[in-house]
Structures are given as C-alpha cells and as structure tokens.
C-alpha cells in the first residue's frame, strides 16, 4: 500500500462526522456476523474486537484514567487468541488522543514489554474510498453473456462460497459459509450476496452489507484466470445499484491494493475519513 498517495479529506466532501460513525458501525457489523463461530472470538465491550476473523480492534471507548493499563489489558486479552492485531482508531473513539497513547505504549512494548508497533504507526489503515452514488455511471465492459444474480437461497450461496473462495485463493472458507448461511438470504438480510455469470458459469462474486446507517461492498472476488475482463467492476456496480435503489446517496469501500484501481474506474476516490491504524505484534511472533 502506498501510504503517500493523495487522499481527499472528508471535510472536502459531503461527509459528516455522523456519516463516518455509520461507516464504523457497518464495519463492526461485518465482523459481528462471524461471532460465536469456532475459532473466532468477538468481544463487544468498551473495546470491540475480533480475533480469528480479521484480528482487529474496531472501536474503543475508554476513560482517561488508567488508560495505559487499559491498553495493556486489551492487548493481553487479545494476545490469548492471536499474535498480531490492527488497532483501528476511528474519529468517534475515545479518548480523543488515543492514538498518541497507543504510540507511547508501543515505545515501551505494551504489557510486560511483549508487544511492538510496526508498519506506518498511525497511518491511514488501508485504502478507504468514497463514491457519490448519484453520479454512478455505466458498468464496465464485460464478456458477452455476463449477468448478475442475487443469492436468494442456500444452493445459490453454496455456489457463491466456491467462487468467492477461489478468487481469494482460500482453502478453508468454512467461517464465511457458516456466518452467512446463519444470517440468511431473506428480504431483511443485512448481507446481500451476488454472483456474476458468463452463461451458466459463475465467474465473480461480491457482498453488499447494509447496516449501521451505511452500505458498502465487501468480498469482491474473481478467480485469477478470469481477471482483467471487467468482472469485478461489473459485479461491484451491480451491488452499488442495489444500494442506490435502497436510498443511499453515497457509499464507501475498504479496498485492497489490487482492487483500488477497479473501484477508481467506477468513480471511487481515495478519502481520508480520519481513521488511523496501529499495528501490533508480539515480539516473539
């Protein structure tokens, strides 16, 4: 990830602090879908975190008093499940100078000197992008016969699981299959899945998560041999059309380095939402 790329500040766009809070709640909901599954711990307390799926801290609401001890306690608890964690600091996290405290705890190694910060300390935490859905243009060109279907039953989701896992090169997709199967595919589902086909062959897949006052596309996946045909962009476009039809005027995505250019072609722009990342790992890891 090129952290020096220019990002448009959220203040320069029609984005309010509440909008960013909705983004955070949507992000939390994504990880909450996996709560309770084997090998996954999701803690929803003053600090909300996930281990086994993401290894990430999603929200922090701590008091100023004894803050260093609370940071150490959090790392100690998470360290029982993983050797590394991304502590994401959103604008709504407290205290307001949490990032500075995390940096200082990193200098002394966290609890018992067992942890260290690495990477870009206090960096943007990935490729956060924003799109004005009212300006969404035409989908990219795709092979003849390409079309998208929404997953409406278990059989279709089983097919989604195979093509999505293939695109990510994943050997074990049991957590995704279990989480989304448990969530269901009815009209009230927050997670809406899509499969792209050429003829009858599944070639790409994605998920739209509508939750927390926000809508975002996740899990965009195309097998390596089928890439560079506009498939990932086209299925993302189909999901965005559903978000727009549900009344959302804008959206965001947390893009991989590989996917960033795909989303830029749809109109997404790199944006600084005020989110900062502190990457921790155990010194023995």
Regions found by a protein language model. Name each.
Residues 40-43, 91-105, 190-204:
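Conserved beta-hairpin
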Residues 48-58, 210-217, 227:
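A conserved beta-turn-beta hairpin within the catalytic core of GNAT-like acetyltransferases
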Residues 102, 263, 268:
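Conserved active-site tyrosine of GNAT-family acetyltransferases
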Residues 1-82, 94:
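N-terminal charged segments
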Residues 67-75, 219-224, 228-241, 245:
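Conserved acetyl-CoA-binding loop-helix of GNAT-fold acetyltransferases
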Residues 81-91, 243-255:
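Conserved GNAT acetyl-CoA-binding A-motif
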Residues 171-225:
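A conserved beta-strand-loop-helix scaffold within acyl/acetyltransferase catalytic domains
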Residues 65-155, 276-280:
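Acyl-donor-binding surface of acyltransferase catalytic domains
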């Amino acid at each position: 990830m090129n952290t020096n790329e220019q990002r448009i500040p959220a203040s320069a766009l029609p984005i309010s602090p509440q909008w960013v809070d909705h983004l955070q709640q949507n992000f939390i909901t994504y990880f909450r879908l996996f709560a309770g599954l084997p090998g996954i711990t999701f803690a929803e307390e003053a600090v909300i975190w996930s281990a086994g799926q993401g290894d990430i801290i999603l929200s922090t609401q701590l008091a100023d008093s004894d803050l260093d001890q609370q940071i150490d306690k959090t790392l100690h608890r998470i360290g029982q499940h993983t050797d590394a964690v991304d502590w994401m600091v959103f604008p709504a996290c407290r205290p307001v100078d949490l990032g500075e405290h995390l940096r200082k705890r990193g200098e002394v190694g966290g609890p018992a000197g067992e942890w260290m910060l690495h990477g870009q300390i206090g960096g943007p935490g990935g490729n956060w992008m924003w799109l004005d859905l009212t300006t969404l243009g035409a989908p990219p060109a795709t092979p003849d016969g390409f079309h998208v279907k929404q997953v409406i039953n278990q059989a279709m989701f089983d097919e989604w699981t195979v093509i999505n896992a293939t695109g990510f090169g994943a050997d074990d997709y049991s957590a995704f299959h279990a989480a989304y199967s448990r969530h269901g595919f009815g009209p009230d589902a927050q997670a809406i899945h899509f499969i792209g086909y050429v003829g009858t062959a599944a070639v790409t897949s994605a998920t739209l998560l509508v939750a927390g006052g926000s809508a975002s596309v996740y899990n965009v996946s195309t097998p390596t041999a089928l890439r560079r045909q506009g498939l990932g962009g086209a299925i993302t476009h189909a999901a965005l059309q559903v978000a727009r039809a549900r009344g959302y005027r804008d959206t965001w995505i947390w893009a991989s380095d590989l996917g960033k250019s795909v989303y830029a072609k749809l109109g997404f722009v790199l944006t600084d939402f005020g989110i900062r990342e502190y990457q921790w790992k155990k010194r023995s890891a």
